[in-house]
């Protein structure tokens, strides 16, 4: 794996978004691109207007052989209570270490919600055994905004037996299929409650995002604070339920 391979993953994600009607929109307040003040590093971010979603963001960080990052979070419209899509891929080139986290991030931890939205992710979890890492994400409460079937790889890239590109492609396909998992017994969460759950998610994530320290080391604290609060989790300034 190298910089070009991670860029290919980004390009595949972009094609998927466009194929579902996505159109790029302007990233404001100087958040679209930032060069490191002390290292040969750049971070770029994009926003997409995608039918059925209120916000879809993508970020790429390029620090050469030291580090490559691809991150994306997609928030469905408030009228849809399906999970938030989360993608986090980090490649530490000098160590040849890969950390990849792919999940349908649940708005609530309830059995009926899991039955409604997680059948396809469960199938992927069973198929791709490499993504059953037992290493936990210590910063986060895994029972809060991660599903029981989060796809997690944390280890040497050389030990990965399956194609990361294939996993990401099937993961995205599965996410777009969740609306087809109809259940007559399932009663959707009302839009006003979904909005509050999105706010809670942003507040929780902004307070615990481990990437903040990374951004701070490369781009300085002032910009890192602004990036996390205004671009990554813009609802974090609102009031939690």
From Swiss-Prot:
Q: Which reaction does it catalyse?
A: 15,16-dihydrobiliverdin + oxidized 2[4Fe-4S]-[ferredoxin] = biliverdin IXalpha + reduced 2[4Fe-4S]-[ferredoxin] + 2 H(+)
**InterPro entries linked to this entry:** DiHydbiliverdin_OxRdtase, Ferredoxin-dep_bilin_Rdtase
Name its species: Prochlorococcus marinus (strain SARG / CCMP1375 / SS120)
Q: Which Pfam families match?
A: Fe_bilin_red
Taxonomy of the source species:
Bacteria, Bacillati, Cyanobacteriota, Cyanophyceae, Synechococcales
Name any one GO molecular function. 15,16-dihydrobiliverdin:ferredoxin oxidoreductase activity
Role noted for this protein: Catalyzes the two-electron reduction of biliverdin IX-alpha at the C15 methine bridge.
Name of the coding gene: pebA
Name its GO BP terms in alphabetical order: phytochromobilin biosynthetic process
Coiled-coil parts of chain: none
Q: What is this protein called?
A: 15,16-dihydrobiliverdin:ferredoxin oxidoreductase
UniProtKB keywords: Oxidoreductase
Q: What is its EC number?
A: 1.3.7.2
Which region is the signal sequence? none
Q: Which family does it belong to?
A: Belongs to the HY2 family.
